[in-house]
Amino acid sequence: MIKVAPSILSADFAYLADEIKKIETAGADWVHIDVMDGAFVPNLTFGAPVVKNIRKVTDLFFDCHLMVNNPEQYIDDFADAGADMVVVHAEATKHLHRCVQYIKNKGMQAGVALNPASPLCLVEEILPDVDMVLLMSVNPGFGGQSFIETTVPKIARLRKMINDAGLNIEIQVDGGINDKTSKQVREAGATVLVAGSYVYGAADTKAAIASLKA
């Protein structure tokens, strides 16, 4: 089943509760929460206190994507705030296995993310321990970027690795997702699609979300 996880990075922060209710009513499956520290990526967004507050307005699955250095130091905060899944970058921690296990020990699902130029071998050894791999299809840090086409064969290679290992792992794709690129990544094996500007910039939010699954 294909899941759509709108990124609230593209929402109107002045009306964040309303923006989340809007995507929930329109058929979103998850809420994708982009956490940036201004160091691992060249931008700052929000942290666990915002997650804790928006947790009060929806029961949707919270997928927290930590684009931060040394993510270990923030895991407790996001667990306490009500995150359902925490995704860390393989490039951002020296002890990926330990980090993933700590996330799971806190009662959350664990995901690992890769930047566009990072090879799949960085996650190969951790696959049996994760619930999801996030492949970035733009360089992280800002919304509204163009889709990097080489992500499509990368998704297919990852799906083969997962299937060959007999594992059941979601593949999430984030960056430049719209009604056209969504078809490409789904056919390659992606199961969770992150879309920010395509969903929040649409005149008809429900139709935009539906088009990502069509």
Regions found by a protein language model. Give the residues of each.
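Active-site/ligand-binding-proximal alpha/beta "capping" segment
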Residues: 139, 146-192
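Short acidic loop-to-helix transition motifs that present clustered carboxylates
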Residues: 117-119, 178
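Hydrophobic residues in well-ordered beta-strands that form the structural core
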Residues: 112, 173, 194-195, 201
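Helix C-cap/helix->beta junction micro-motif
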Residues: 58, 106, 165-167
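Conserved N-terminal beta1-alpha1 strand-loop-helix module at the mouth
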Residues: 1-87, 91-95, 102, 110, ...
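Predominantly soluble domains enriched in secretory-pathway, periplasmic, or organellar proteins
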Residues: 100-102, 118
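Short, acidic/turn-prone active-site loops that include or flank metal/cofactor-
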Residues: 91-93, 115-117, 138-141, 197-200
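Short, electropositive alpha-helical surface patch
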Residues: 83-91, 186-195
